[in-house]
Each structure stands twice: as structure tokens, then as C-alpha cells.
């Protein structure tokens, strides 16, 4: 029996998300008294795989197959299911990002396993096996008991943090038979984004809503994000109006993020928006309406016009950086 963690890579490199998964898996394996097995799919160099050892990985399985060169939900779910069966995995851990959300339900069916989605902490108990997760668009918390022999967990991003447990992992190259007919995905064209921090990777996010009043007013917001080393985001109405690209839309129907600092500018704080940002460590709200719902979710608030507040924040950050 083992705890199996699937770590996604991006063009052969791991990100914080991957290290957080390994940290969580190591903690879970310790609770259960089971070995931790980390699975990587695709062409990843040994030097990159060894980085997982810093967070508790001691045994890494590197799976590479022509049928798995392009991500496909069905093919990846089949491959992970085969590895889980071979390793007699009691718990399989994935990220709750788009990839994990696509794979986990399929994996659940293949393994006849109960699924705890969007978990944010280690289990409250292991017998019974009870996990802790947000529910009702982030407005409540739920304790979910998973009763099946095999269990699947998807971990909410930036919810557990990185726990260093350095060691030298063993790396095993392996293969599993994956039917090429399962692969329904083809890549017609690949465009890489360069020079811009990905929203889901950012530890600081500055987000704007309709309170920005016009697409022409985003200069100070973008400048503040750049000064802080963060990313920009927006509410759904803003992206629907075409003020900002849809890739910046956060909320229940957009990207789910959990940065260390989320600055909401001119955003009222509708339930749908808060569902996508409520896992942020610290929320700062700037709004002219002192009764806006966003202030109830925020740790800090400024009641004022964004057009007046943002330039002052920009100047304050510049002064601090120049000291």
C-alpha cells in the first residue's frame, strides 16, 4: 500500500504547485504510515526530478510513452490508474487545477474510488478517513468521509504550502501499456506566453472590476502589479465587456487562484467572484461603497475612489523600493 502523488510538469519543469503536492503527499504518507510514491509523466530530466526530493519524495516513477506526449484526459487517467493499481495505492493525490479536475473523476471511476475534491488540509482523521474542503462557493467548509478502499484527493492550490524534507530520491523509469486509440487530442499549434507571470502562479495579484470605470484607467493598476512582482486579474463583467483579456478573469466561472496577497480594486465582491479568490492568504479591498460585500472577505480595506487611491499606492511602493 502507498500514497501516490501525480506531479504535473510544464515543458519538462516543475512549479510550486508540484512541490506543494509532494509536501502534502509526504505529510499524508507519514500520517498513514505508508510509503510515498511520486509519479511524473513526460520527458523530464533527472536533475529536475531530483528537485522533488527536497520536499519528501524518496521514490519517483518517471513514465514516458509516445501516447502520453500530448496531454489527454482519458490517456493520462488510464496511465495513472495502471500505476496506482501496480503500486497498490491507498490514496492518489492530484492538484485541483484544470488538469486534476479533468483526470480525477475519470480516475475515480477506473479505480472505484471515492473522491475528495478541493481539499485544503491533511485529513482530520484517517480511520475514518475524513478530509476538509471548502463548499458552497467558498462560503462554508465541509468534512467529507471517504469510505472506499482506494481514495482520490485533489489539493486546492496554495492551500498547504511547501514543507522541506530534503533527501535523495531514487528515480525509476517505467512504462505502462496505453492504447493510442484513447488519445483524442491533437495539437494544431502551440503558442508560448513569454515575459508575463501566469495568474495561477502569482503570489501577488492585483485585480480590477467595474469600479475602474473604463478600460483606459488600468495603467496604475498594471503598474502596481508590476512593482509588487505580481499579476493582473479582473472580474467577469470586465472581461465580458472586453476591457481585459478573458485569461485574467477570476471567479467561479474563471480561474481559481490562491495568492498570498489579493488586491481587489473596484470589485463589489459577488459570491461568484469570491468563490475564485477566497483561498487567498490576505485580501485587500478598495471600493467606494463601504457596504460592498468584498469588505467582509477582506482583511484590510480602503474606502475610496480607485482613481485616487491607486496612484498613491504606486508612489508609496516606489518610495519603499527606492529606500
Describe the function of each predicted region.
Residues 1-323:
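N-terminal glycine-rich FAD/FM-binding segment characteristic of electron-transfer flavoproteins
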Amino acid at each position: 500500500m502507498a500514497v501516490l502523488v501525480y506531479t504535473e510538469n510544464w515543458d519538462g519543469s516543475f512549479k510550486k504547485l508540484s512541490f506543494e503536492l509532494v509536501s502534502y503527499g509526504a505529510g499524508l504518507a507519514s500520517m498513514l504510515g505508508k510509503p510515498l510514491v511520486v509519479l511524473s509523466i513526460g520527458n523530464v530530466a533527472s536533475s529536475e526530478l531530483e528537485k522533488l526530493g527536497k520536499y519528501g519524495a524518496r521514490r519517483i516513477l518517471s513514465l514516458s510513452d509516445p501516447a502520453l506526449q500530448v496531454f489527454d484526459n482519458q490517456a493520462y487517467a488510464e496511465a495513472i490508474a495502471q500505476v496506482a493499481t501496480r503500486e497498490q495505492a491507498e490514496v492518489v493525490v492530484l492538484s485541483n487545477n484544470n488538469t486534476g479536475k479533468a483526470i480525477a473523476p475519470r480516475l475515480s471511476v477506473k479505480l472505484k474510488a471515492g473522491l475528495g475534491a478541493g481539499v485544503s488540509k491533511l485529513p482530520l482523521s484517517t480511520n475514518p478517513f475524513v478530509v476538509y474542503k471548502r463548499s458552497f462557493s467558498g462560503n462554508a467548509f465541509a468534512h467529507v468521509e471517504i469510505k472506499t478502499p482506494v481514495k482520490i484527493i485533489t489539493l486546492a492550490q496554495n492551500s498547504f504550502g511547501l514543507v522541506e524534507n530534503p533527501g535523495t530520491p531514487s528515480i525509476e523509469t517505467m512504462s505502462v501499456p496505453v492504447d493510442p486509440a484513447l488519445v483524442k487530442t491533437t495539437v494544431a499549434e502551440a503558442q508560448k506566453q513569454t515575459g508575463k507571470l501566469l495568474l495561477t502562479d502569482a503570489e501577488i495579484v492585483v485585480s480590477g472590476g467595474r469600479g475602474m470605470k473604463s478600460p483606459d484607467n488600468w495603467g496604475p493598476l498594471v503598474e502596481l502589479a508590476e512593482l509588487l512582482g505580481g499579476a493582473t486579474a479582473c472580474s467577469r463583467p470586465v472581461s465580458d465587456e472586453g476591457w481585459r483579456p478573458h485569461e485574467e478573469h477570476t471567479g467561479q466561472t474563471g480561474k481559481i487562484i490562491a495568492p498570498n496577497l489579493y488586491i481587489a480594486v473596484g470589485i463589489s465582491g459577488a459570491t461568484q467572484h469570491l468563490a475564485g479568490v477566497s483561498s487567498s492568504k490576505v485580501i485587500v479591498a478598495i471600493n467606494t461603497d463601504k457596504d460592498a460585500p468584498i469588505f467582509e472577505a477582506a482583511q484590510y480595506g480602503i474606502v475610496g475612489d480607485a482613481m485616487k487611491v491607486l496612484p498613491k499606492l504606486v508612489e508609496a511602493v516606489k518610495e519603499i523600493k527606492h529606500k
